[in-house]
Protein backbone atom coordinates (compact mmCIF):
# COMPACT_ATOMS: atom_id res chain seq x y z
CA UNK A 1 0.00 0.00 0.00
CA UNK A 2 2.85 2.39 0.90
CA UNK A 3 4.54 1.89 -2.48
CA UNK A 4 1.24 2.58 -4.25
CA UNK A 5 0.87 5.82 -2.28
CA UNK A 6 4.48 6.76 -3.09
CA UNK A 7 4.09 6.21 -6.85
CA UNK A 8 0.50 7.48 -7.14
CA UNK A 9 1.36 11.09 -8.17
CA UNK A 10 4.07 10.23 -10.72
CA UNK A 11 1.92 7.55 -12.37
CA UNK A 12 -1.01 9.95 -12.67
CA UNK A 13 1.31 12.68 -13.97
CA UNK A 14 2.66 10.28 -16.60
CA UNK A 15 -0.83 9.20 -17.66
CA UNK A 16 -2.15 12.77 -17.84
CA UNK A 17 0.88 13.89 -19.81
CA UNK A 18 0.51 11.04 -22.30
CA UNK A 19 -3.26 11.62 -22.68
CA UNK A 20 -3.14 15.42 -22.76
CA UNK A 21 -0.01 17.55 -22.24
CA UNK A 22 2.54 18.76 -19.69
CA UNK A 23 0.19 21.39 -18.27
CA UNK A 24 -2.66 18.97 -17.55
CA UNK A 25 -0.04 16.56 -16.23
CA UNK A 26 1.33 19.27 -13.93
CA UNK A 27 -2.13 20.07 -12.57
CA UNK A 28 -2.79 16.37 -12.00
CA UNK A 29 0.61 16.03 -10.29
CA UNK A 30 -0.20 18.91 -7.94
CA UNK A 31 -3.64 17.53 -7.05
CA UNK A 32 -2.35 13.96 -6.70
CA UNK A 33 0.47 15.12 -4.42
CA UNK A 34 -2.00 16.97 -2.19
CA UNK A 35 -4.11 13.79 -2.00
CA UNK A 36 -0.97 11.72 -1.37
CA UNK A 37 0.08 13.96 1.52
CA UNK A 38 -3.45 13.79 2.94
CA UNK A 39 -3.32 9.99 2.84
CA UNK A 40 0.13 9.89 4.42
CA UNK A 41 -0.99 12.26 7.16
CA UNK A 42 -4.14 10.21 7.76
CA UNK A 43 -2.14 6.97 8.03
CA UNK A 44 0.93 8.26 9.92
CA UNK A 45 -0.51 11.31 11.71
CA UNK A 46 2.50 13.32 10.49
CA UNK A 47 4.38 14.47 7.42
CA UNK A 48 8.16 14.24 7.37
CA UNK A 49 10.29 17.24 6.51
CA UNK A 50 11.00 15.59 3.14
CA UNK A 51 7.27 15.26 2.45
CA UNK A 52 6.72 18.93 3.26
CA UNK A 53 9.62 20.07 1.08
CA UNK A 54 8.48 17.89 -1.82
CA UNK A 55 4.92 19.19 -1.53
CA UNK A 56 6.08 22.81 -1.38
CA UNK A 57 8.35 22.41 -4.42
CA UNK A 58 5.66 20.68 -6.47
CA UNK A 59 3.14 23.38 -5.62
CA UNK A 60 5.56 26.27 -6.25
CA UNK A 61 7.09 24.91 -9.47
CA UNK A 62 3.75 23.54 -10.64
CA UNK A 63 2.06 26.90 -10.10
CA UNK A 64 4.86 28.69 -11.96
CA UNK A 65 4.51 26.19 -14.81
CA UNK A 66 0.76 26.72 -15.08
CA UNK A 67 0.60 30.49 -14.49
CA UNK A 68 3.53 31.34 -16.78
CA UNK A 69 2.68 28.50 -19.20
CA UNK A 70 6.34 27.47 -19.15
CA UNK A 71 7.16 23.78 -18.76
CA UNK A 72 10.75 24.49 -17.73
CA UNK A 73 9.66 25.13 -14.13
CA UNK A 74 8.20 21.68 -13.46
CA UNK A 75 11.18 20.10 -15.24
CA UNK A 76 13.59 21.88 -12.88
CA UNK A 77 11.76 20.85 -9.69
CA UNK A 78 13.71 17.57 -9.25
CA UNK A 79 17.00 19.39 -9.87
CA UNK A 80 16.22 21.88 -7.12
CA UNK A 81 15.01 19.15 -4.74
CA UNK A 82 18.09 16.97 -5.17
CA UNK A 83 20.45 19.96 -4.97
CA UNK A 84 18.76 21.14 -1.77
CA UNK A 85 19.07 17.66 -0.28
CA UNK A 86 22.77 17.48 -1.17
CA UNK A 87 23.44 20.93 0.28
CA UNK A 88 21.43 20.18 3.41
CA UNK A 89 23.19 16.88 4.09
CA UNK A 90 26.63 18.38 3.43
CA UNK A 91 26.07 21.51 5.53
CA UNK A 92 24.63 19.48 8.38
CA UNK A 93 27.87 17.51 8.66
CA UNK A 94 30.42 20.19 7.81
CA UNK A 95 28.85 23.21 9.53
CA UNK A 96 26.61 21.91 12.31
CA UNK A 97 28.45 18.61 12.91
CA UNK A 98 25.14 16.70 12.66
CA UNK A 99 24.44 13.67 10.53
CA UNK A 100 20.84 13.98 9.36
CA UNK A 101 20.69 10.38 8.20
CA UNK A 102 21.67 9.20 11.66
CA UNK A 103 19.17 11.59 13.25
CA UNK A 104 16.40 10.30 10.97
CA UNK A 105 17.23 6.60 11.00
CA UNK A 106 19.39 6.08 14.08
CA UNK A 107 16.45 4.95 16.19
CA UNK A 108 15.67 2.23 13.64
CA UNK A 109 19.18 0.78 13.27
CA UNK A 110 22.43 0.92 15.14
CA UNK A 111 25.49 1.54 12.98
CA UNK A 112 29.03 2.71 13.78
CA UNK A 113 29.58 6.46 13.31
CA UNK A 114 32.01 6.01 10.38
CA UNK A 115 29.32 4.03 8.54
CA UNK A 116 26.78 6.80 9.14
CA UNK A 117 29.31 9.30 7.80
CA UNK A 118 29.95 7.23 4.66
CA UNK A 119 26.22 6.84 4.09
CA UNK A 120 25.75 10.58 4.45
CA UNK A 121 28.52 11.33 1.95
CA UNK A 122 27.20 8.73 -0.50
CA UNK A 123 23.78 10.41 -0.27
CA UNK A 124 25.39 13.80 -0.97
CA UNK A 125 27.10 12.40 -4.08
CA UNK A 126 23.92 10.60 -5.18
CA UNK A 127 21.82 13.76 -4.81
CA UNK A 128 24.37 15.83 -6.75
CA UNK A 129 24.39 13.17 -9.48
CA UNK A 130 20.58 13.06 -9.67
CA UNK A 131 20.38 16.86 -9.69
CA UNK A 132 22.87 17.09 -12.55
CA UNK A 133 21.35 14.30 -14.62
CA UNK A 134 17.86 15.80 -14.30
CA UNK A 135 19.21 19.23 -15.25
CA UNK A 136 20.91 17.71 -18.29
CA UNK A 137 17.83 15.80 -19.47
CA UNK A 138 15.55 18.80 -18.80
CA UNK A 139 17.83 21.16 -20.74
CA UNK A 140 18.89 19.02 -23.70
CA UNK A 141 16.04 16.60 -24.35
CA UNK A 142 12.41 16.96 -25.33
CA UNK A 143 9.67 17.18 -22.75
CA UNK A 144 8.51 13.71 -23.74
CA UNK A 145 12.01 12.31 -23.12
CA UNK A 146 12.12 14.11 -19.76
CA UNK A 147 8.72 12.70 -18.71
CA UNK A 148 9.85 9.19 -19.68
CA UNK A 149 13.08 9.75 -17.77
CA UNK A 150 11.08 10.84 -14.69
CA UNK A 151 8.95 7.69 -14.78
CA UNK A 152 11.65 5.16 -15.59
CA UNK A 153 14.23 7.14 -13.63
CA UNK A 154 12.56 5.88 -10.46
CA UNK A 155 14.77 2.83 -10.91
CA UNK A 156 17.78 4.95 -9.83
CA UNK A 157 16.64 5.50 -6.24
CA UNK A 158 15.39 1.92 -5.94
CA UNK A 159 18.74 0.49 -7.03
CA UNK A 160 20.57 3.01 -4.84
CA UNK A 161 18.53 2.10 -1.75
CA UNK A 162 18.86 -1.65 -2.34
CA UNK A 163 22.64 -1.26 -2.71
CA UNK A 164 22.70 0.68 0.55
CA UNK A 165 20.73 -2.09 2.20
CA UNK A 166 23.43 -4.59 1.26
CA UNK A 167 26.13 -2.22 2.53
CA UNK A 168 24.30 -1.52 5.81
CA UNK A 169 23.55 -5.20 6.43
CA UNK A 170 27.27 -5.87 6.96
CA UNK A 171 27.29 -3.51 9.95
CA UNK A 172 23.94 -4.21 11.59
CA UNK A 173 24.21 -5.78 14.99
CA UNK A 174 22.11 -8.88 15.48
CA UNK A 175 20.54 -10.01 18.73
CA UNK A 176 21.43 -13.65 18.06
CA UNK A 177 23.65 -15.23 20.72
CA UNK A 178 27.10 -16.25 19.53
CA UNK A 179 27.82 -19.98 19.71
Curated annotation (Swiss-Prot):
Subcellular location: Cell inner membrane
Disulphide connectivity of cysteines: none
UniProt key word Cell membrane: yes
Membrane-topology descriptor: Multi-pass membrane protein
Pfam short name (any one): IspA
Main function: Plays a role in cell envelope biogenesis, maintenance of cell envelope integrity and membrane homeostasis.
UniProt-recorded name of the protein: Inner membrane-spanning protein YciB
Organism: Albidiferax ferrireducens (strain ATCC BAA-621 / DSM 15236 / T118)
